[in-house]
């Protein structure tokens, strides 16, 4: 998987995400003294990390020089392992990325094609992956099972240190030339390959394209680790082998363990793999950015880029530009405190309605959205600060530097100089409060989060223990801020952004209407050139080579050589979370009494099925408005935003569909309030819920209309970007919307229908201006507010006993206050959900829909209806989906067809089956594969081992660790209590091969209705008249 950095969000969590977690334990420092020798390693450093309640142990392998970091966390059962390598890409062929894929295609100890994927069926891991960064590659997994941990570590270590790296794996995962029909030598030759198609998909995302080209320009020595599709086809098999030999050596390895399992056992296993390697002197080759190799003060680069055909803007208004300052080298240990200060400052300048760059560049209408590279970034040896915008005219691009400096000099510097009454003081307190909350908040993926935060700098020579010791830097900052106030930030700006001699890099992407077509044309020219150089013998050899590859992809593998867990490793009884049912004002309160480290988690929920269905599509906009419009009657949004961050860990307002676990044709539309806070600030959650829900300003003032205009534009852009990243989910939403009422509503509020609706809002806003908002949208938002205030809430609390008791009193007051603020409204039940349920058509015939969007690769879905959560059939279908995926579809969709991913998923709660492909060069072909596979379960010769593997895969998610705040949540939100969860667990465990054949026949074969959706470019796909083509109108 390519690890990318696209800043789609400017949330405050960006400042604190690497710090967010805590585990209440007291590590033992005496366990691993410095100098202790363990299995060829020597302990070089042992240090407490009190902010995370960990002990960090750093070790060095004496013979090879390999380093290991262990984070001892005796009370966390979710153990993590990783091995990372420094992998500077030598060019733009994507060799680190392709190697990441091919190492996992079989090894000396496990000579099975794709052991990585096959281990997902033999494990209870809750996380398994491999990731390629700018100049590093790492292979992490997490599991709560000690036997599983040992098995997976063995597979990972064998994969990276003794991979087979067969030529056929290179062809499959990297790139190859192949006949369009692999069995027809006369058919057209084309480029294929998993990574090749993945990167074609990435390049379809304009935000990714802008960012990766920016990085290539500002950091030319680093090269593109993911690979440029034009260059991927230049990589040779020999080049792959050479890159592995050079980089995948113990001297270049960083291994990591986290959790409660014995360090000694891990080191013993790792050191055995190191024995076969000769000692090798290794030095860290840190590539330098353009600022280090060219001492110029100003750099200016312009490149051509794609036009976004979905946002309704003229080509001349689609320039993207950014200005970046060089802040120094983040690998310098003396820079760590400056980096922390820059994180705080970056949040002040960019995050939220209070931030000056947001106010002056987005709200003012100068641009629509920040560019993907905006903000503070640490990439290898470059710490940079960037201000960038999307959707500008050429004139605004030319004036952009002047505009940014005007904001800095006329707004930011004066505010930083206003020590006595600056609004920045409150915002800084809010940021520090979020960090404090982060230390206390429990997250089940804590270990992996720490790993992700240290790897990029660790492979470049930074001590990871220093990176983890946040408390020292935080204490330093608090003291510095107490003594010097805002001056510390003013001085940062004066030394860098305001310094006329600071190195500055301007990067612009100029829109070209023919850009996407040119990419396709270039690909065709590349393949034509390659083909023109082939002799008939060459073509025959390619044909035979690919026939052999296709044959290999279909061959059964001897998976007996792989380690595995068994059904006996799955606990027969699942976790039960004791829930007390309290009562406040005759309203039920679900109470989960558990240690939450001083935090309270609160929810309020009500049934709003009476809401007229015509208002459903406006719910996401309404929810967004509550915390992003102009604020409330008493609190402007700038103050409200700071108040939320200073007093709580966050509050949200959302709507959700809850399907009856016993009947997929019955559901409720619910409205949910959520909040989290420190115990001593609990009352703030309820005060803010009340104020926001009852007094948010939905009037036609200029301020409200301006905010609403910006919000709608931002929603549109975010949704468009999401399609390229999650196209298979959107395709599935379209297919499933014809199957059940819950999926129909889901498409309206979060699927392609919602995207289309927001695009229509933007189109009308563009043509009619803010008068349209005042006349059409504001009255609807006011109407929804009235509806949401109808009905009664019920409540949920998670915390210790003292917190629960205190919050019951707070809920009692909130409930009385919210009830007294209920407006008079006549509810017409016939307009609501019941009318939709009564009229829903369950008898859709098969149909094929192409959603015509300009993507180089496509996404496909074939949907069918299933059964309820509580039914035995539902459990069998969940297991069936795993067998279809790993025994049939994976090889056909990914390995043969070259899509990045594909399979069959089952939504157990909503009862829908979905065949899918992701980043697929031929999604229409995948649809035919799905059709051909419908009866596969009747003919497959599955055995008990196959059934066991499918059950293991299902239980990876069933038994995955969850947040403390989620314990018992399904009983409150979905009416699924522990006993029903246990019943479904027993249905999983009791599923037989006969059950699988029965549900195959009943739901896949006998049900002939296939709801098909493909998202892609019809100029490439050229579908026939059997397809309905759905064009997005703007």
UniProtKB/Swiss-Prot annotation:
The active site is at residues 100, 173. Its cofactor is Zn(2+). Pfam families: M16C_assoc, Peptidase_M16, Peptidase_M16_C, PreP_C. InterPro entries: Metalloenz_LuxS/M16, Pept_M16_N, Peptidase_M16_C, Peptidase_M16C_assoc, PreP_C. Monomer and homodimer; homodimerization is induced by binding of the substrate. Keywords: Hydrolase, Metal-binding, Metalloprotease, Mitochondrion, Protease, Transit peptide, Zinc. Binds 1 zinc ion per subunit. One of its GO terms (cellular component) is mitochondrial matrix. Residues 1-26 form a transit peptide. It is found in: Mitochondrion intermembrane space; Mitochondrion matrix. One of its GO terms (biological process) is protein processing. GO terms for molecular function: ATP-dependent peptidase activity; metalloendopeptidase activity; zinc ion binding. Zn(2+) binds at residues 97, 101, 198. Its EC number is 3.4.24.-. Degrades mitochondrial transit peptides after their cleavage in the intermembrane space or in the matrix, and presequence peptides; clearance of these peptides is required to keep the presequence processing machinery running. Preferentially cleaves the N-terminal side of paired basic amino acid residues. Also degrades other unstructured peptides. May function as an ATP-dependent peptidase as opposed to a metalloendopeptidase. This is Presequence protease, mitochondrial. The gene is CYM1. Belongs to the peptidase M16 family. PreP subfamily. It is an enzyme of class 3 (hydrolase).
């Amino acid at each position: 998987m390519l690890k990318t950095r696209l800043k789609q969000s400017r949330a405050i969590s960006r400042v604190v995400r690497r710090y967010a977690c805590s585990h209440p334990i007291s590590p033992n420092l005496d366990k691993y003294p410095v100098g202790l020798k363990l299995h060829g390693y020597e302990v070089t450093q042992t240090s407490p990390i009190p902010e995370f309640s960990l002990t960090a142990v750093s070790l060095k392998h004496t013979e090879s020089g390999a380093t290991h970091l262990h984070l001892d966390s005796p009370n966390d059962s979710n153990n993590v392992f990783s091995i990372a390598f420094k992998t500077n890409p030598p060019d733009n062929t994507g060799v680190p990325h392709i190697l990441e894929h091919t190492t996992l295609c079989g090894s000396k100890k496990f000579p099975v094609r794709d052991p990585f994927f096959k281990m997902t069926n033999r494990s209870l891991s809750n996380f398994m992956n491999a990731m390629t960064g700018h100049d590093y590659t790492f292979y992490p997994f997490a599991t709560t099972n000690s036997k599983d941990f040992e098995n997976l570590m063995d597979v990972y270590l064998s994969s990276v240190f003794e991979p087979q790296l067969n030529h056929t794996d290179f062809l499959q995962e990297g790139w190859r030339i192949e006949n369009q029909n692999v069995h027809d030598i006369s058919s057209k030759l084309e480029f294929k390959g998993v990574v090749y198609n993945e990167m074609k998909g990435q390049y379809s995302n304009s935000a990714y394209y802008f960012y990766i080209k920016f990085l290539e320009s500002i950091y030319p020595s680093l090269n593109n680790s993911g690979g440029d599709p034009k260059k991927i086809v230049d990589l040779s098999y020999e080049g792959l082998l050479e890159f592995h030999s050079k980089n995948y050596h113990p001297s270049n390895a960083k291994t990591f363990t986290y959790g409660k399992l014995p360090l000694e056992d891990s080191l013993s296993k790792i050191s055995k793999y190191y024995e076969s390697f000769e000692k090798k002197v290794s030095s860290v080759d840190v590539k330098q950015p353009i600022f280090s190799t060219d001492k110029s003060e100003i750099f200016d680069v312009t490149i051509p880029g794609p036009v976004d055909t979905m946002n309704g803007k003229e080509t001349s208004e689609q320039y993207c530009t950014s200005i970046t300052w060089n802040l120094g080298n983040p690998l310098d240990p003396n820079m760590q405190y400056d980096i922390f200060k820059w994180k705080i400052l970056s949040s002040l300048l960019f995050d939220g309605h209070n931030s000056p760059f947001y106010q002056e560049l987005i709200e003012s209408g100068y641009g629509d959205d920040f560019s993907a590279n905006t903000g503070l970034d640490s990439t290898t040896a470059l710490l940079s600060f960037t201000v960038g915008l999307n959707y500008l005219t050429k004139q605004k691009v030319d004036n952009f530097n002047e505009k940014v400096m005007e904001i800095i000099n006329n707004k930011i510097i004066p505010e930083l100089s206003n020590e006595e009454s600056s609004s920045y003081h409150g915002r800084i307190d809010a940021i520090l409060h979020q960090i404090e909350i982060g230390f206390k908040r429990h997250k089940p993926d804590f270990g992996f989060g720490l790993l992700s935060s240290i790897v990029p700098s660790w492979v470049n020579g930074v001590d990871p223990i220093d990176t983890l010791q946040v408390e020292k830097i935080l204490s330093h900052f608090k003291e510095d801020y107490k003594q010097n106030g805002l001056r510390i930030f003013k001085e940062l700006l004066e030394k860098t952004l305001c310094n006329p001699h600071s190195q500055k890099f301007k990067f612009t992407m100029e829109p070209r209407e023919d850009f996407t077509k040119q990419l396709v044309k270039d690909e065709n020219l590349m393949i034509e050139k390659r083909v023109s150089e082939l002799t008939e013998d060459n073509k025959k050899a390619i044909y035979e080579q690919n026939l052999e590859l296709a044959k290999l992809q279909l061959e059964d593998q001897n998976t007996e050589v792989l380690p595995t867990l068994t059904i006996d490793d799955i606990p027969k009884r699942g976790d039960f979370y004791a829930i007390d049912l309290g009562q406040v004002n005759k309203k039920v309160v679900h109470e989960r009494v558990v240690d939450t480290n001083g935090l309270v988690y609160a929810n309020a929920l009500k049934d709003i099925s009476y809401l007229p269905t015509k208002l459903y599509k406006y719910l996401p906009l309404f929810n967004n408005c509550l915390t992003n419009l102009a604020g409330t009657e008493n609190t402007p949004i700038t103050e409200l935003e700071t108040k939320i961050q200073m007093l709580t860990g966050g509050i949200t307002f959302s709507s959700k569909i809850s399907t009856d676990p016993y009947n997929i044709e019955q559901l409720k539309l619910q409205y949910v309030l959520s909040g989290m806070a420190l115990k001593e600030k609990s009352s703030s959650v309820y005060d803010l819920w009340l104020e926001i829900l009852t007094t948010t300003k939905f009037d036609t003032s200029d301020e409200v209309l301006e905010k609403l205009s910006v919000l709608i534009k931002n929603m549109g852009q975010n949704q468009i970007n999401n399609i390229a990243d999650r196209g298979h989910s959107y395709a599935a939403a379209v297919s499933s919307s014809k199957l059940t009422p819950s999926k129909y509503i889901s498409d309206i509020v979060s699927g392609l229908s919602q995207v289309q609706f927001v695009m229509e809002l933007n189109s009308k806003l563009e043509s009619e201006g803010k008068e349209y908002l005042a006349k059409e949208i504001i009255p609807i938002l006011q109407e929804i507010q009235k509806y949401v205030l109808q009905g009664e809430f019920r409540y949920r609390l998670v915390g210790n006993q003292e917190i629960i008791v205190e919050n019951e009193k707070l809920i009692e007051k909130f409930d009385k206050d919210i009830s007294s603020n209920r407006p008079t409204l006549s509810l017409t039940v016939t307009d609501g959900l019941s009318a939709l349920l009564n009229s829903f058509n369950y008898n859709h015939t098969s149909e094929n829909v192409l959603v015509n969007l300009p993507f180089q690769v496509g996404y496909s879905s074939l949907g069918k209806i299933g059964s309820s959560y509580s039914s035995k059939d539902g459990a069998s279908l969940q297991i069936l989906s795993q067998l279809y995926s790993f025994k049939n579809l994976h090889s056909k969709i990914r390995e043969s067809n070259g899509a990045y991913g594909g399979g069959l998923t089952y939504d157990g709660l909503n009862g829908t089956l979905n065949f899918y492909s992701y980043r697929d060069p031929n999604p229409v072909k995948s649809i035919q594969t799905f059709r051909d596979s419908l009866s596969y379960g009747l003919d497959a010769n599955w055995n008990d081992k196959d059934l066991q593997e499918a059950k293991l895969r299902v239980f990876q998610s069933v038994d995955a660790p969850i947040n403390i705040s989620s314990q018992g949540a399904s009983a409150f939100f979905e009416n699924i209590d522990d006993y029903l969860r246990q019943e479904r667990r027993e249905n999983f465990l009791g599923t037989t091969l006969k059950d699988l054949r029965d549900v195959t026949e009943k739901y896949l074969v006998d049900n002939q209705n296939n709801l098909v959706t493909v998202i892609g470019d019809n100029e490439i796909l050229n579908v026939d008249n059997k397809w309905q083509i759905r064009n997005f109108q703007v």
